[in-house]
């Protein structure tokens, strides 16, 4: 299985370089609303499981659609990590009114924002791609293959595009609980954005999937000091607590 992942990933990295985006592209004479209405709306079914999304033998394609206004909004300040309304198309079906934003910690923004201050990331987007998060239930209680969120990691600093997928795969095979990850092709408004790591989001559905009962508290890591080297406040650490959804 390990060698199959390496071989498969080598192929998809080379294949993805030549991908054209003729399909699912909005024509000049069409509006986004009309274009989206041409798709059947996705409906969650109990037979839809997240195992399909993270199948190691699949190279899924995800199409994200945003108005020009919303795309410009997140492009102008990615580090704000502000959700805007968008649409997700997967295998010919659309999930409407999802939240779309860029995501990342300090390392994800290095060399990708107009400001050179990597400690306090700010400025507009200058990289071809950035990591993204899709909030399926941003408006209404919706699920996509049993999940509430998707995340696509740009891996801009990883020339192999393999570290994340292989790392999590090895952890799981060592018996350590870790997110599932494969690769995905991501398009934004019909344009090929790149090859991303499609990595499982750690949230309520994740704990339900991987831990018996899924109850308890879920913590997100927090950086212990600020840019001045001073310790964070107690309140800052409390805000790092994420309760299960």
Where are the predicted features?
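Phosphate/dinucleotide-binding and metal-coordinating scaffold of catalytic cores
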Residues: 17-245
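Sec-dependent N-terminal signal peptides
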Residues: 5-13
